[in-house]
Amino acid sequence: MCGVARKPLTVSGNRVLAGGSAASFSGNSLFWSNNGCGGDKFYNANTIGWLKADWKSDLVRAAMGVKERGGYLEDPVGNKAKVKAVVDAAIANDMYVIIDWHTHNAEDYRSEAIAFFREMARMYGKYPHIIYEIYNEPLRISWSGVIKPYAEAVIGAIRAIDPDNLIIVGTPYWSQNVDEASRDPITAYKNIAYTLHFYAGTHKQSLRDKAQTALDNNVALFVTEWGSVDCSGDGAVNAAETWAWVNLMKTNGISNANWALNDKREGASALSFGASGNGGWGSEQLTVSGALAREIVRSWGGDTPPPPPPCSAVSFPGVVEVEAYSQMPKVQLRVETAAIGETGEPPIQCHSKQSPPSVGRGQ
């Protein structure tokens, strides 16, 4: 594998820093690794290399399914091999990589999680590229009574081998109730962040308010999944809410991974059905959500810039030639009090998840 270039990630207050400096990163989450679910064809070096070169992705998430059909409990050797292929490729391409214990019931498989993460820590703990995500999405269970004790046990096992790399912990209610976790954070170990998931078609200002509460309580957040559609993993893209979330993440230095690099016939899939499992996708092979995700990931950068400015009005006489570059969902030009396009043309537009079968995406 290539030499180390990525800076180590550390937590300071409510920020995840890279090499001690403010930073945030954007990239892709793969679909469930489970045998036969379809998304596992993307668990290879060609896909990871393409994401780095074409999407400019700084991170990738290997979502290793645990209990569902074809997952780790049924085939540990096969699923670990897929994860290792992604991790090796990410390190070779100098990307951060999230090793995700992808289940809604991790507390039922504590010993298995400990054994798995011990193996990953022994194998990869020396690389600063590594991020451990020890619980994907807890359901309607207690943070203090269930999730936190599980997390502390798994974190302890990892820290005995890898004392430094970032560990991300899932939060109650499909990793939405970050405010609950922030009121009783894990204090026995350093470099801990908390999982926040959002799907812009469903999750709007009320969830952003929970995120702000957690930040105000001085815990660091990491969005290991986000989608521009609704929480089922399907539905239409909500561009306006997606950009509102981008603004929150950039303003607060929150790194993120888009769900999902897959070609399943659903709104959250970045690729059209039948796309190659080895990269090389043209624009015609991107879905609407995939094109938006690629735009966001490519324009992210490795630092934390100021948020984009709000809409503003400028008025002056004369002829104007305009080019618009914006992270806002819409730009509108007006003549006097009328918007150009109100008589027939639309206003100028700057911008144009689902689990294996039988498993719901969540709330």
List each model region and its residues.
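A mature extracytoplasmic/lumenal domain signature
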Residues: 29, 64-66, 103, 136, ...
